[in-house]
Amino acid sequence: MIDKIICDELAKSSQESNVAVLLSGGVDSISIALAAHRLNKKITAYTFHLKDQPTYDAQKANEISNIMGWTCKTIEVPTDNVINDFIRLRREIQCVKKTHYECCFPFLYVYPQIKEKEVLSGWAADGYYGVSKKANIHYKHTKEKFDEFREDYFKLDHRAGYLWHKRIADMHDKTFITPYLTEPVKQFFWSKDWYELNQP
């Protein structure tokens, strides 16, 4: 069900036959890449890790790309210019919160490597599940409380730093496509309570 909704939303929003996918080892980004694959798009996956610090996510992104026949480019993010990078994030991207900096910093180096016009992402999908400590303690017990948590999470100025990431995409003249933030996907998840989404 959700895979069809994601495919439908991606078909509506993506106009290019060659697309970039921000790929990690997680199901959110993989589900977007698989949807693009089903739509017969040529996928170039982009993943990253800090210089000399390979990660599970980058390794898994390469593994799934090899299995699926996608090109995968791993970007090594340098750490020797962090002070200037963070100043740039404040001035150009308007980062304020710690999470803004953490989520945006690597993409200062990823986006210049992306050749495709459209950049697909599973951005903010984890917000639907309420897996944070805060959600587990305070919001999972009734659907009303769970919806309250999700309503706050998906406010425009939250969404896991979506607005700040999009500024980087815009700066590089890329179209940032996030199917998990579309209304039909939201409605699917909003029909479920915490237990339906998190228990077998």
Language model regions located:
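ATP-dependent adenylate-handling active sites, centered on carboxylate activation for C-N bond formation
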Residues: 1-200
